């Protein structure tokens, strides 16, 4: 195991060393990872063909047609290959969705080809090569300069959510805002050991998972992430689509998601034009909640990350809460601390609910009050959520026991009765009870890190505002 981890770390370092070289030349981290993905797929296809297993890529557009070229010939051929492969209507087309070259220097592009060419990827175990790629995605997601953090959910939180939802190998799992595929991959890892039956394993690899994202770049990364774990090797389970406009009738047993927050981007198709049954709102997170409610099967289970406003806002949001409590059993809320996401100050929760019965009691685990995390200096670990996972009692919710009591008023696990839930103004679900008057024990390093995270978030917001205002005559 130690040798495997060392090899993984060595490969990740090689990949990131080139990333730093390219960054100095003006190639962004995320653009580099995307090009690496395209080139890695070409190399793996070539290795597959050498083993007599056939090629998925048409003649004239393969690894061997590019790798010996240099200078402008390399750039021209590479761009021709990307354009051609993006036309495919299967797995290749998904990975090469709207593919274009972002490395304009032949010397730098050749470095990436050389680095990928020096390794044999296809025969690596799926867990190993997948772990390498995931490590790269995670490093990219944590790097503030990359801007990729908006697509990244902490692995510790993903793992805890999957552990308590407990998807089964015969069930279908969806993430309608899948990012780089973290939830789907964690669900796969959870389901795979449950049976060695070949038909069940085949179903798991090719039919059980579904993910969607409306950003071509993210679809490429998610598709490759799953492909490297031997998932969807014939047809990717990831599609490039705006989930909020999806009117298909496909339903799922389990939904796991951390949808984008904020308002819908300017110029987007209005959600209510495609989904007239939705309660009309401009909030992305509330619309995603409505979408999730519409695609989970009766008896199905949901775990979704949502900001505080979904629990407290009035008007349309209050009406969505009313529908949620009437048609679903919202049995659990996990209150999350700040500092675990790219947008450092956002306050979030995980809502756990099942379709079929109305909400009665709601159990709340407060992992926010008095808890401090940052993405860099004090990241959340899976062990940090052991208390919540143990209290949740997955599979036997009837055995739950509060840690809160009159004798222990700061217990983090508390049940709110049906009467308490439905007597709240506008069914607001912002349950708070812990009173910890603690000194602020953050170090200077932690404070500076939090300040940097917030400054980055503000800078990103200003840049987006400038883009919006750029086309307006003020």
Model-derived regions, located:
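Signature of N6-adenine DNA methyltransferases within the class I
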Residues: 1-2, 245-252, 262-418
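Non-catalytic, mostly N-terminal accessory regions of nucleic-acid modification and defense proteins
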Residues: 1-169, 234-243, 335-338, 360-375, ...
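Residues within alpha-helical segments
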Residues: 20, 36, 188, 223-224, ...
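A generic structural signal for residues located within well-ordered alpha-helices
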Residues: 30, 128, 153, 217, ...
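Surface-exposed acidic, glycine-flexible loop patches that form ligand/cofactor-binding
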Residues: 121, 200-202, 295, 400
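Conserved S-adenosyl-L-methionine
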Residues: 147-257, 262-264, 272-275, 282, ...
């Amino acid at each position: 195991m130690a040798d495997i981890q060392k090899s993984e770390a060595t490969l990740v370092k090689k990949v990131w060393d080139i990333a730093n070289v390219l960054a100095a030349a003006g190639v962004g981290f995320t653009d580099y990872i995307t090009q690496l993905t395209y080139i890695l797929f070409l190399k793996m296809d070539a290795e597959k063909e050498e083993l007599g297993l056939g090629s998925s890529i048409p003649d004239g557009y393969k690894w061997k047609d590019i790798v010996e070229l240099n200078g402008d010939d390399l750039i021209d051929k590479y761009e021709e290959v990307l354009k051609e492969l993006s036309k495919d209507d299967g797995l290749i087309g998904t990975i090469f969705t709207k593919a274009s070259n972002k490395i304009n220097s032949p010397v730098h592009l050749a470095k990436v080809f050389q680095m990928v060419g020096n390794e044999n990827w296809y025969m690596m175990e799926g867990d190993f090569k997948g772990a390498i790629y995931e490590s790269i995605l995670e490093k990219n997601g944590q790097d503030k300069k990359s801007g990729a953090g908006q697509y990244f959910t902490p692995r510790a939180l993903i793992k805890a959510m999957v552990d308590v939802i407990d998807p089964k190998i015969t069930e279908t799992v969806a993430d309608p805002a899948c990012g780089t595929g973290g939830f789907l991959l964690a669900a796969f890892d959870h389901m795979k050991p449950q049976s060695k039956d070949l038909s069940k394993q085949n179903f798991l690899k090719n039919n059980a998972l579904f993910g969607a994202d409306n950003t071509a770049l993210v679809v490429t990364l998610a598709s490759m992430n799953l492909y490297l774990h031997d998932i969807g090797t014939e047809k990717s389970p990831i599609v490039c689509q705006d989930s909020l406009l999806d009117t298909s009738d496909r339903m799922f047993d389990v939904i796991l998601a951390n949808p984008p927050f904020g308002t819908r981007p300017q110029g987007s198709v209005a959600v209510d034009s495609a989904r007239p049954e939705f309660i009309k709102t401009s909030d992305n997170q509330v619309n995603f909640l409505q979408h999730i409610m519409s695609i989970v099967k009766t008896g199905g289970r949901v775990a979704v990350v949502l900001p505080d406003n979904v629990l407290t806002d009035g008007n349309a949001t209050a009406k969505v809460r009313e529908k949620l409590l009437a048609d679903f059993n919202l049995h659990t809320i996990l209150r999350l601390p700040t500092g675990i996401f790219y947008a450092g100050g956002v306050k979030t929760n995980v809502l756990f609910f099942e379709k079929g019965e109305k909400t009665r009691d709601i159990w709340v685990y407060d992992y926010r009050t008095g808890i401090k995390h940052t993405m860099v200096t004090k990241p959340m670990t899976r062990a940090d959520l052991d208390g919540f996972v143990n209290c949740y009692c997955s599979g036997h919710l009837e055995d739950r026991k509060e840690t809160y009591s009159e004798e222990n008023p700061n217990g983090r696990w508390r049940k709110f009765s049906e009467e308490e839930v439905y007597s709240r103004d506008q069914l607001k679900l912002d349950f708070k009870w812990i009173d910890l008057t603690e000194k602020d024990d953050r170090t200077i390093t932690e404070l500076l890190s939090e300040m940097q995270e917030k400054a980055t978030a503000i800078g990103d917001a200003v840049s987006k505002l400038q883009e919006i205002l750029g086309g307006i005559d003020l």
